[in-house]
Amino acid sequence: MIDYREAGTKDFNRIAQLSAKSFGHYPYFDCAFHNAFKNEESYNTYMEKLHRVNIKANAQQNKCFVGVKDGEIVSAALIQNPAKKKADVEDYVKAGGLSLVYPVGLSKILDFFHFSEDARADCDRKHPSAWYLEVLAVDNSMKGCGLGSGMLQDCLIPYVQKQGGQELTLITNTEGNRKFYVKNGFQEFSQRTLEKNGQRVGNWSFCMDIPKHRCTRGTNRIK
């Protein structure tokens, strides 16, 4: 049984760990940063710091949730409310973003910020009133156990519906994730290829319609 609750600042380190391991060699991050590191340990440490800053910068204006099993956080998600402003450079600086400059350099950080905006541009343009799924991460040791689907169906979708949201969008960059989101009721509406540091990365945009009276499994599961 997974219990869901809104994350607090004390949870950010654990969420960063989950995110770093879930997205450690995700094409979206690999193409931007991996070549700046000499070994996997230093790259993984940097990824954890990057995700911690991202969570801190976005959680102030948006909602971050965790799934808890036997007292341990095993899944996490960050969703952005279209009525709230997106985190900007100032928000990232306040969240400790300057600590990300070494060893990759400031220009690479700023370039990644713009790269991220471009990656989600189709979602913002075609579905400007939609909620946006920024992060969905699960414990690697429990992948395949339904944690990601549970977070979507039992926590995020009921929450967005309760807030009056009618759409939820996201992007992904792997074939495996494409299948996962289709299985969970999302529809792909855009496909592009992004280029970064000589690498080509597939970028797929998805949207789910959330009717006002959509029947979900976990309407009362969020604490």
What are the functions of these language-model segments?
Residues 169, 187-205:
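Conserved catalytic-core motifs of GNAT/GCN5-like acyltransferases
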Residues 78-135, 195-199:
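Conserved acyl-donor/pantetheine-binding loop and adjacent beta-alpha core of acyl/acetyltransferases
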